[in-house]
């Protein structure tokens, strides 16, 4: 355990194109091996495709997608007397946003479209419509929490 306490959160700069911190976080999640300009090209291309398909502001579409993917509950392992229980706990708002972005990017990488721009755009559009693998992941997480509701009194 560190004696100094948790490391302070560094402030996120707003995205230069859309002026949104969410887009900055999405770029950082898409980022691989330090290639930030490539990650920005992918995210901006995906948001442009989303704008072309919906005709609305892509940041609003992204926010709607994130609202459909953000988990409210998750299960965490807790060891009690030799047995490990899956204890349902509420998810903090910053963690739920991080999880939602991680799931969006992760499941867009598994899609079958040809380019990453198409995959990310279609996953964002599916999530904003309540479809897609990332929304299913959220529902599965909530089902796990509901199934283990009996262990909620072990919450810490």
Swiss-Prot record:
Sorted UniProt keywords: Ribonucleoprotein, Ribosomal protein, RNA-binding, rRNA-binding, tRNA-binding
Xref: SUPFAM superfamilies: Ribosomal protein S7
Domain of life: Bacteria
GO-annotated molecular function: rRNA binding; structural constituent of ribosome; tRNA binding
Annotated InterPro entries: Ribosomal_uS7, Ribosomal_uS7_bac/org-type, Ribosomal_uS7_CS, Ribosomal_uS7_dom, Ribosomal_uS7_dom_sf
GO biological process: translation
PROSITE patterns hit by this protein: RIBOSOMAL_S7 (PS00052)
GO cellular component, one term: small ribosomal subunit
HAMAP family assigned: Ribosomal_uS7_B
Family: Belongs to the universal ribosomal protein uS7 family.
Chain's role: One of the primary rRNA binding proteins, it binds directly to 16S rRNA where it nucleates assembly of the head domain of the 30S subunit. Is located at the subunit interface close to the decoding center, probably blocks exit of the E-site tRNA.
Description of how the protein assembles with itself and partners: Part of the 30S ribosomal subunit. Contacts proteins S9 and S11.
Protein name: Small ribosomal subunit protein uS7
Organism of derivation: Mycobacterium marinum (strain ATCC BAA-535 / M)
Gene name as annotated: rpsG
């Amino acid at each position: 355990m560190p004696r100094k306490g948790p490391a302070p959160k560094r402030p996120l700069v707003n995205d230069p194109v859309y002026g949104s911190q969410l887009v900055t976080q999405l770029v950082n999640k898409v980022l691989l091996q330090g290639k930030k300009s490539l990650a920005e090209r992918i995210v901006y291309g995906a948001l442009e495709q989303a704008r072309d398909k919906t005709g609305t502001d892509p940041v609003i579409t992204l926010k709607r997608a994130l609202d459909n993917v953000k988990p409210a509950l998750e299960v965490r392992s807790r060891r009690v007397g030799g047995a490990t229980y899956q204890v349902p706990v509420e998810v903090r708002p910053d963690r739920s946003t991080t999880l939602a972005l991680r799931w969006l990017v992760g499941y867009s990488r598994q899609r079958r479209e040809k380019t990453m721009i198409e995959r990310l755009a279609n996953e964002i559009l599916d999530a904003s419509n309540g479809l897609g693998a990332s929304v299913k992941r959220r529902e599965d997480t909530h089902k796990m929490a509901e199934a283990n509701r009996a262990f909620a009194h072990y919450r810490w």
